[in-house]
Amino acid sequence: MMFFNDKKNERNGILVLPTGAGKSLIVADIASRLHQNVLVLQPSKEILKQNYAKYRSYGLDNCSIYSASFNSKEISEVTFATIGSIMAHIDDFDHFKAIIIDECHGVNPVEGQYATFIRKVKRKVLGLTATPYRLATAQGIETKDKGFMPNGSYKTSDYFIDDFHPMPGVTLKNACILKFITRTRPRIFHDVLYEVSIQTLLQRGYLANLRYFDMTTIDTSRVKRNSTGRDYDEQSLFEEFSRCGLGNQLSDIVKRLLHPKNGVPRKGILVFTQFITESEQLAREVEGVAVVTGATKSKERDRILEDFKSGKIKVLANVGVLTTGFDYPELDTVVMARPTMSLAMWYQIVGRAIRPFEGKDGWIVDLGENIKRFGKVGDLTLREDKPGQYYISGVVNGQYKPLTNVYFY
C-alpha cells in the first residue's frame, strides 16, 4: 500500500513472483486494501478470468470485467480488463488512481498499447511477473538511460550498455541482449519492490522439484537468426530438424516414456513443438496422441484439455499455445522439442510441470539445447550487485552464469 500512497515517489515498481507464489491472491489482496479505483490489466482472457475469480472468492463484489472477450464493459471500483479493450476508451479510466499490470514483462516500453495507455493516463503502475526480462536486438538498444516517469517526462542518467566482445561471425546486427525490465531503455518500470525466490518456494514445498534430461541432437550453431535477431529463422530451423531427424527422435522418446523397459510409465506428457509437422508426425506414430494448435477451435481445445487432465489422453502435443494459462498440477512430464532464445519461454514451459502434487516425480525432457543454454529453472536467481543493477543468473555447466544484461549470441 505504501507504494501507491507515496505521492513523492513517481517511480513505477514490480513484484517478482515465480509460478506458485499465488499471484492472483496477491493481486486481490492489494486491490482490496487500496480502497480506491484500481485498474487491473492482464494480457489474456484466461489470466483475467483467474484474477477476477480469485478476487470474487473473498466475498468482494465491488469489481467488474471490462473485456470484449467476455462481452462485458462495466467499470467498477476495481476493474479487471484486457489492454486491447480499453484502448478506444482511455478517457473513461482517467479517474483511476492505481494501475496493476499482471505479466508485466510483456509491456513494450517503446511502443504498443501499454506504453500508449500509460503515457496518456500518467498514473503510478505496479507490475507483477515471474519473468522480469525482455529480449532485444543489440543494434536497437540506445546508449542512454532514459526512464519513463508517471508524469510523462523522460529522465536521462547513466550509460548502461555492457562492453560488446563479439564472437566469430557475430556483430551488433545479429547479437541480442536479454535485459531486466527495470534496465531497458526507455523503460516503464524502475524498481524491484519485492521478490520471492524460486529456491524459497521449492524449500517450502510450494513448487515441485524436477528432474532434467538433456536428449538434444540438434545443433543450434547451424541455425540462422530471423530478421529481428531475437529468435531462430524458421526455414533454417526446419532444415536443421530434418537433418538430425527430430521428428523420429521425438516419437521414439515419447514411446519410451509411455512404455519404459524399467520403471513406471509417465502419467501425462505435454509436448512443445516448433512446427505442426512434428506434432502431426507424433500423432501418426504414437497411439493416443492429441494435438492442439492456434487453429484448434475453442470448444475442441477445451474438450482435449479436459480429456488430457482426466487421463483419457496420455500425450498432448501443442504448437505454442499452452505456454501460459494452463494449470494441471498432476502433469509429470514436459517434452521440449524445440530450441528457444527466450528465457521467459523456457521458464513458462518448465513451469507447466513445476506445480506440486502428492507423489509426483516431475521430468523435463529437452531436445532443443535449452538446458545447455539456460540451465535448470530452480537455479534461477535474482541478483543486485550494485543498487538498481538487477539481473538473473543461472547454473550452466556447473557454473553460475549471468543470463540477463549480457549479450546473447
Describe the function of each predicted region:
Residues 19, 25-57, 276:
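Conserved Walker A/P-loop ATP-binding site and its immediately adjacent core
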Residues 352-382:
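Conserved segment of the helicase C-terminal RecA-like domain
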Residues 91-134:
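SF2 helicase catalytic motif II
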Residues 162, 167-171, 190-270:
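Conserved interdomain linker/interface between the two RecA-like ATPase lobes of SF2 helicase motors
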Residues 96-97, 314-318, 324-340, 345-352, ...:
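A short beta-strand element within the Helicase C-terminal
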Residues 49, 64-73, 280-281, 288-320:
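Conserved helicase ATPase core of P-loop NTP-dependent helicases/translocases
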Residues 1-16:
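Conserved pre-motif I regulatory segment
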Residues 57-90:
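Inter-Walker segment of RecA-like/P-loop motor cores
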